[in-house]
Design a protein with these regions (language model features):
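Pyridoxal 5′-phosphate
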Residues: 1-171
Length: 171
């Protein structure tokens, strides 16, 4: 739901159109729905594994389809990452996110992976802390990646706990 609400807000603010891909009776995307990814598509966002039915999605196929039309592919790995190996380079997604609490980590933790080339061209959305490199009276220079997206104090304890949870699940 959080993912959907976010995209609804983006569409309301920008005038973009939100479209959906539906599953067939066996829990797979139909060719008709995959054909909705066309040259007008800017972003394809989807879950690697359904949190309702547990169906695995063909991540590499969907990412390749998105890239074939110049769209960005965003994969929600909250349901998949705790249970299966995740290789963002292999799936070639542009962004990949998962929450820590679904991996035995603490609440309010998670990971957002983004391709460096895309992140480098993005503006920070939160201001302060380590994301600032230098401040002048009339301008500010933002820090390099990954720091330009790390405003405020970091949740060090949560990051350490998430690292331990990842190590535990790897074994």
């Amino acid at each position: 739901r959080q993912d959907l609400v976010t995209w609804q807000r983006v569409c309301q603010k920008t005038g973009a159109v939100l479209d959906y891909m539906y599953l067939d009776e066996e829990g797979h995307f139909t060719e008709e729905d995959l054909a909705k990814i066309d040259d007008k598509t800017k972003i394809v966002a989807f879950a690697a594994v359904s949190n309702v039915f547990g169906m695995k999605r063909p991540v590499k196929e969907i990412v390749a389809k998105a890239h074939s039309v110049g769209a960005i592919a965003i994969v929600d790995g909250a349901q998949s990452t705790p249970h299966m190996k995740t290789d963002v380079q292999d799936m070639d997604c542009d962004f990949f996110a998962f929450s820590g609490h679904k991996m035995c980590g603490s609440a309010s933790t998670g990971v957002l992976y983004g391709k460096k080339a895309i992140l480098a061209g993005m503006e920070p959305f939160l201001l302060g802390g380590d994301m600032i490199e230098y401040v002048k009276e009339q301008s500010t220079t933002f820090n390099e990646l990954p720091f330009k997206f790390e405003a405020g104090s970091q949740n060090v304890e949560g990051a350490v706990a998430l690292h331990a949870a990842i190590d535990y699940l790897r074994d």
